[in-house]
From Swiss-Prot:
Pathway where this protein functions: Protein modification; protein ubiquitination
InterPro entries the record matches: Cullin (IPR045093), Cullin_CS (IPR016157), Cullin_homology (IPR016158), Cullin_homology_sf (IPR036317), Cullin_N (IPR001373), Cullin_neddylation_domain (IPR019559), Cullin_repeat-like_dom_sf (IPR016159), WH-like_DNA-bd_sf (IPR036388)
Originating species: Arabidopsis thaliana (Mouse-ear cress)
Record's subcellular location: Nucleus; Cytoplasm; Cytoplasm, Cytoskeleton, Spindle; Cytoplasm, Cytoskeleton, Phragmoplast
Protein name: Cullin-1
Disulfide bond sites: none
Function: Involved in ubiquitination and subsequent proteasomal degradation of target proteins. Regulator of mitotic processes which plays a role during gametogenesis and embryogenesis. Together with SKP1, RBX1 and a F-box protein, it forms a SCF complex. The functional specificity of this complex depends of the type of F-box protein. SCF(UFO) is implicated in floral organ development. SCF(TIR1) is involved in auxin signaling pathway. SCF(COI1) regulates responses to jasmonates. SCF(EID1) and SCF(AFR) are implicated in phytochrome A light signaling.
């Protein structure tokens, strides 16, 4: 049976009934929903009109009429309804109309489904769904988006001022911008977001201008942090998620970047004041706010560095002033107080770096640079390297000024080693430390072997094995020396004929590890010569390949002084003992006679005689009785001497070792510079002057800050010794001579 042909007008009239019914439903009029039979009739009508033989295939006409149906509805109903409303009411109407429009598109595209499947697919035309959305875009959106944008921004600003707004409505309206873009974000970004960001900038620019005048730095930061939190909430509630970084950037720029220096430099509440008053919460907030801004932390780190430097400089100045106003004894106590205070300062600001500033490298660098400034200053002629070595000595020696528990000692040593990192003359510290370590070990002044080894381990980790190898050798030497002494005592036990009749303890040391000491060919008293010979005999039974050099200046003697009232045990140096023993054979000796008998230098003899005749314990009487020793003086044994103690120690005036240490270090530095230059040139063969100097500085600065002039001088010296030569063509180039 042949199907009856439907002409265009008749078919479209029927479709209009369905479209009208749909519009009535959308307008909320009392209209029953479509039943399946009505739906099928509408679908079939379209199907039939599209599958009739030409010229009755109305596919193209129906495709056009589909679009016209939307256009008619929008022009007659939707636009008039929207044009009469404003602000929030207009936004509500827009959302309602958009929701209805999507329903209309869904229903109509189902009625016209056959068009989508065949006609549109074959002709590559826009699909029905897209045509429906395009109608709304071209007729409604293009006319209204500017008003909509203004209404939305007005509501956002209301909310910023603390008013309650309908966030769900804003979300729904802003979703239209995204949906109209059909998968692209241009409409949202160009028609709404760019204006909203501009408004945000203006809004916060106004706020910042008044807050920066009225508020303290902490209050301003609190407000800023709150604003940023609120803006992020806005994104979560109604803006598109892609707006967050842009929005936050605008707020940060206006509140934190534009007024950064004014905020941080506020006189009574800015960054300096917060550091001065230990406002850790505010400083943490400052870090949180500024670390998200490109280079935002640099000024904060800079102020931090200046603040720490000023505090450190003040401590150094305080120690300097005290040292100037006081006697030497209390000055050295002040210097020790200084190191303790510097450690406390470091502890305090390290907590700031790790907690307030979240371990950020900029603040580690600022702290390091600040400490390097004041940790390399001298106090009353003492370098910081020496002060630090003395501080360690006070902790590690018996009866030192620092009375601490084992744990506290370990903790303090750890901190001292950290401070050493800031000191440029590490080699000078090493030399002072070695000198003091030698005294602790040789005169049995070290309080605890474990602590001695522990600090060496810490120093080794910090500065490398080369730094501590000699010191470790010294500690080991002493253990070996004790074993050696036990063997010597066993030897005497089995060779009674060899016993010198004097208790003798000898400490044998390895030359390379210990500081250099002057050794003199002093004419020893016969009692002592016997001791030396006996020990030599013992030592040769152990080894024939080692030479013993005696350092008498480090020895100690216990001698019995028989005075008129009572006998007193005198603890003296080997040299002092040698002087006193001369008086066993004669009561009176002139300076010249003593000098001839002992074969000492004038300088040493004056020190010895002064300690025995002019100081606290006058074992010898001097003629004339003056405070200084001269070459015309005569000395006699003071038999009337007495003291309430049965045993007394007669000290020698201390020799200022500082000059010698500095000289030794300077000498070592010359060798170190030579070695560095040769090492570099050996690997590079040819190198420019400037580059050689800078590589040299880089290699050496782990141990000391090499002086450029000294490097140049060493280069010249190496040229004269045929290690290097200047290039004939270019005197700024050096060649290595193998």
């Amino acid at each position: 049976m042949e199907r009856k042909t439907i002409d265009l007008e008749q078919g479209w009239d029927y479709m209009q009934t369905g479209i009208t019914k749909l519009k009535r439903i959308l307008e909320g009029l009392n209209e029953p929903a479509f039943d399946s039979e009505q739906y099928m009739m509408l679908y079939t009508t379209i199907y039939n009109m599209c599958t009739q033989k030409p010229p009755h295939d109305y596919s193209q006409q129906l495709y056009d009429k589909y679009r016209e149906a939307f256009e008619e509805y929008i022009n007659s109903t939707v636009l008039p309804a929207l044009r009469e409303k404003h602000d929030e009411f207009m936004l509500r109407e827009l959302f309602k109309r958009w929701s209805n429009h999507k329903v209309m598109v869904r229903w109509l595209s189902r009625f016209f489904y056959y068009l989508d499947r065949y006609f549109i697919a074959r002709r590559s035309l826009p699909p029905l769904n897209e045509v429906g959305l395009t109608c709304f875009r071209d007729l409604v959106y293009n006319e209204l988006h500017s008003k909509v944008k203004q209404a939305v921004i007005a509501l956002v600003d209301k909310e910023r001022e603390g008013e309650q707004i309908d966030r769900a409505l804003l979300k729904n309206v802003l979703d239209i911008y995204v949906e109209i873009g059909m998968g692209q974000m241009e409409r949202y970004e160009e028609d709404f977001e760019s204006f909203m960001l501009q408004d945000t900038s203006s809004y916060y620019s106004r706020k910042a201008s008044s807050w920066i005048q009225e508020d303290s730095c902490p209050d301003y930061m609190l407000k800023s942090e709150e604003c940023l939190k609120k803006e992020r909430e806005r994104v979560a509630h109604y803006l598109h998620s892609s707006s967050e970084p842009k929005l936050v950037e605008k707020v940060q720029h206006e509140l934190l970047v534009v007024f950064a220096s004014q905020l941080l430099e506020k006189e009574h509440s800015g960054c300096r004041a917060l550091l001065r008053d230990d406002k850790v919460d505010d400083l943490s907030r400052m870090y949180r706010l500024y670390h998200k801004i490109l280079r935002g932390l640099e000024p904060v780190a800079n102020i931090f560095k200046q603040h720490v430097t000023a505090e450190g400089n003040a401590l150094v100045q305080q120690a300097e002033d005290t040292a100037t106003n006081q006697v030497a004894n209390t000055a050295s106590v002040q210097e020790q107080v200084l190191i303790r205070k510097v450690i406390e300062l470091h502890d305090k600001y390290m907590v700031y770096v790790t907690e307030c500033f979240q371990n950020h490298t900029l603040f580690h660098k600022a702290l390091k640079e600040a400490f390097e400034i004041f940790c390399n200053k001298t106090v009353a002629g003492s370098s910081s390297a020496e002060l630090l070595a003395t501080f360690c000595d006070n902790i590690l020696k018996k009866g030192g000024s620092e009375k601490l528990s084992d744990e506290a000692i370990e903790d303090t040593l750890e901190k001292v080693v950290k401070l050493l990192a800031y000191i440029s003359d590490k080699d000078l510290f090493a030399e002072f430390y070695r000198k003091k370590l030698a005294r602790r070990l040789l005169f049995d002044r070290s309080a605890n072997d474990d602590h001695e080894r522990s600090i060496l381990t810490k120093l080794k980790q910090q500065c490398g094995g080369q730094f501590t190898s000699k010191m470790e050798g010294m500690v080991t030497d002493l253990t070996l020396a004790r074993e050696n002494q036990n063997s010597f005592e066993d030897y005497l036990g089995s060779n009674p004929a060899a016993n010198p009749g004097i208790d003798l303890t000898v400490t044998v040391l390895t030359t390379g590890f210990w500081p250099s000491y002057k050794s003199f060919d002093i004419n020893l008293p016969s009692e002592m010569i016997k001791c030396v010979e006996v020990f030599k005999g013992f030592y040769e039974t152990k080894t024939k390949h080692r030479k013993l050099t005696w350092i008498y200046s480090l020895g100690t003697c216990h001698i019995n002084g028989k005075f008129d009232q009572k006998a007193i045990e005198l603890i003296v140096s080997t040299y002092q003992a040698a002087v006193l023993l001369l008086f066993n054979t004669t009561d009176k000796l002139s300076y010249t006679e003593i000098l001839a008998q002992l074969n000492l230098s004038h300088e040493d003899l004056v020190r010895l005689l002064h300690s025995l005749s002019c100081a606290k314990y006058k074992i010898l009487l001097k003629e004339p009785n003056t405070k200084t020793v001269s070459q015309n003086d005569a000395f006699e044994f003071n038999s009337k001497f007495t003291d309430r103690m049965r045993r007394i120690k007669i000290p020698l005036p201390p020799v200022d070792e500082r000059k010698k240490v500095v000289e030794d270090v300077d000498k070592d530095r010359r060798y170190a510079i030579d070695a560095a230059i040769v090492r570099i040139m050996k690997s590079r063969k040819v190198l420019g002057h400037q580059q050689l100097v800078s590589e040299c500085v880089e290699q050496l600065s782990r141990m000391f800050k090499p002086d450029i002039k000294a490097i140049k001088k060493r280069m010249e010296d190496l040229i004269t010794r045929d290690y290097l030569e200047r290039d004939k063509e270019n005197p700024n180039m050096f060649r290595y001579l193998a």
